[in-house]
Amino acid sequence: MKKYILSVLLGGAFMFTACSDFLDEEPKGDITSEGYYKTAQHAISATNAIYDYLIIGYAPNGLWDKNYGGTFYNDYWVLQDMFADNSETNQTSIDYQSVENMQIDQYNQPVELLWRDFYQTIKCCNVVIDKVPSIDMDVTLRNQLVAEAKFFRAMMYFDLIRMFGDVPLREHNVESAAEDVTSRTSKETIYELIFSDLKTAETDLKYAERFGGGRPYPASASALLARVYVTYAAEHQSKEHYQLAVDKAKSVIKSFPMLKNYGDLFKVTNRFNTEIIWGVNFSAALSEGWKGGQFLVRLLPALDGVSNAQGWENATEDLWNSFDQQNDQRLDVTLKKSFTYSDGSVEDFDKPYVFKYWDSQAEPKGNNTEAIFPAIRTAEMYLIIAEALNEINQGANEEAVIAINAVRNRAGLTTAVPTDYKGFKNAVLNEYRHEFVMEGHRWFDLTRMCTPQEFVSIIKAAKPESTPKEYHVKFPIPQREIDLSQNTITQNEGYGQ
């Protein structure tokens, strides 16, 4: 669900609505886009609108609008774990039950809204990329703003092609229906834009924060490139791109060291720590600032003294059992089957719940949280190095073992990992699973590292009642988009048949 009552103060009203509904809404407001982009402040406001869409989204009918909540508000990180083997829903919603049971179709509303979130964010990025370069302003700041837009455009398109395959490519701001692109563009063409955007971002992003947290750094672009390269390499069996992934990941690790304690990653008092290469700032949304993270509402079970803990999602028993119960220190941080109150009383749960985002000392009453969404962090860079080197060498060399052990040793795991190709690959996949619960990784990792047949077997083992299919390595194209395109956008194989 994308609805929940929050206290919200929305700033930059024109810029926010000017980026509104990418596919079928006309820009709103008294100032036309042609007459607006004249000053440095206009450029900054246009760029800030991107961050609004990442968090707030576009909800013209208020907080109960089905569109409420942006790209990273909740469904992004929920879908990637639920359309896999990590989580289940406790909602009565058919939409979420169908995701859990692998019976998803082209009418699924969470998928449709996420698609729209991606493209609405791209719309805002394209406005900046098209309009800001012609503004007479400080060149360094101008380049920085355009680089931010290119960073996020690359991120949105990368997730789109990972989830849906070929998708419409809109490289420029669409100001009329006649200019719109209503057919699917090949992933290969979109990859070229992603590579280009991120290389520009590496050069033109700056480390000095303009306002608030959550701005991408040059290393953020390098880290995202590492993620893109390892995915491209897996799709194309390209040792060259595996090596590029290794090189980019190494370049980031030097500047963003991992924390010593896994639990410290998620403390509200430790937001934007050295391990978070880029994160979504739910506290100061880089416009007027507001709280709105849904982690506690969706993931915490009902607890005495904790407000609005709904427990809409829980972890699977398969995920719980996959941890080293005695030694993996991430387990107690990430999942709980019971909770001990301050008076010593214990509440047991009938299933494991995700607790990692709750800083009970800083936010004892829960509800909407200031916890950051750690979209890209250093532990992933170590695992990318391990994964890529294993593919390059068809087995783990010493450097690959050192990389995976950087993550394992922090978790308290000291046993040796297998170094044969398949054994090490499974070890890396397990580390991704345990390290990034509810961080938007699992489905992406499974579809990158496993064959469709392996994907089906893994899901079926974790969820025996589910009906996974090999075509579930893609999500369905929302029927709304097919209808709006008058069927020039085609459906992915297996869906709607």
Model-assigned labels for residue ranges:
Residues T17-A18:
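C-terminal motif of bacterial Sec signal peptides marking the signal peptidase cleavage site
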Residues I44-N48, D52-G57, S87-F164, T185-T189, ...:
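Conserved, well-structured interaction surfaces
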Residues N173-E175, E179-A234, E240-L244, K250-K260:
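Hydrophobic, small-residue-rich alpha-helical packing segments that form membrane-like cores
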Residues K38-H42, T47, Y51, I55-N61, ...:
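Elongated scaffold/linker segments in the mid-to-C-terminal portions of large proteins
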Residues I161-R162, P168, E209, T231-Q237, ...:
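Short coil/turn linking the two alpha-helices of tandem helical-hairpin repeats
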Residues M1-Y4:
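Positively charged n-region of N-terminal signal peptides that target proteins for export
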